Design a protein with these regions (language model features):
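Predominantly soluble domains enriched in secretory-pathway, periplasmic, or organellar proteins
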Residues: 1-241
Length: 241
């Protein structure tokens, strides 16, 4: 419940007798995602510059971590780091940074709910995504005021924890690049091009498709009206983040 600074967990196994349990958190809650086991819920408290972590089995908060200015993970990203084991990451609305933390309290208790590393980017962003079959984590820089930076996405190597490529998605003056989504097998990732400027530009949007191995452009789906979020049904059903 965003404005209250509370997480409400609803047990709907008996619809006639719903049970709601409340956990106090920092404010304001916005955008969350589960770890790969689907036990721990990871959610941004962006006004407090924190990520909050809830154990959905015990229904208790297990951690709270300062990550940077206004974390905004979108649908989030989970992957395996060579040093820290299972990790997750977030972009930030208030600064150009991706923060990565451990999220495996059973297998890697020393790393759980602690920062593994942070990486600086060129500007603040909205969304971060990956896929188990991809070597990379992709994130945007949509909130930076300079068009050239808004129009580019960054590629983070899972093995090294370093940014290995900047992809200029568009060079249209009033456009920006936003929101990455992988296809079901992780062989492609799709990025939206969102064109501003009123009705005259409504149908100038695009979805750009990239090869997730070579990072090269495959094709562009053109003539779209301000495309933004793209959600692969298979990935969401099987919790591939």
């Amino acid at each position: 419940v965003k404005e209250l600074g509370q997480m409400w967990q609803v047990d709907y196994s008996d619809l006639d007798n719903l049970r709601i349990e409340q956990q106090n958190t920092h404010k304001f809650l916005h955008d969350g995602f589960f770890d790969p086991t689907q036990r721990y819920f990871q959610i941004a408290a962006n006004a407090s510059n924190r990520m909050e972590f809830i154990d959905t089995e015990t229904r208790k908060a297990v951690g709270s971590l300062v990550t940077g200015k206004k974390p905004h993970p979108g649908a989030g990203a989970n992957w395996i780091d060579p040093k820290c084991g299972p990790v997750a990451g977030t972009t930030h609305l208030g600064e150009g940074k991706v923060t990565v933390w451990g999220n495996d309290p059973k297998g890697h208790p020393d790393q759980a709910w602690k920062i593994c590393y942070s990486v600086e980017s060129d500007g603040p962003g909205l969304f971060i995504r990956t896929h188990p079959n991809s070597d990379y984590v992709i994130f945007d820089q949509t909130k930076h005021p300079e068009p050239e930076i808004q129009q580019a996405i960054k590629v983070l190597d899972k093995k090294t924890g370093k940014i290995v490529k900047t992809i200029q998605v568009t060079d249209v003056e009033t456009a920006l690049a936003v929101h990455t989504e992988f296809n079901a097998d992780g062989s492609e990732f799709w990025v939206s091009v969102w064109v501003r400027g009123g009705k005259k530009n409504w149908l100038k949007g695009e979805i750009v498709v990239y090869d997730s191995k070579t990072l090269k452009e495959i094709t562009r789906v053109k003539g779209l009206e301000t495309p933004t979020g793209k959600f692969n049904v298979s990935n969401r059903m099987h919790h591939r983040t």
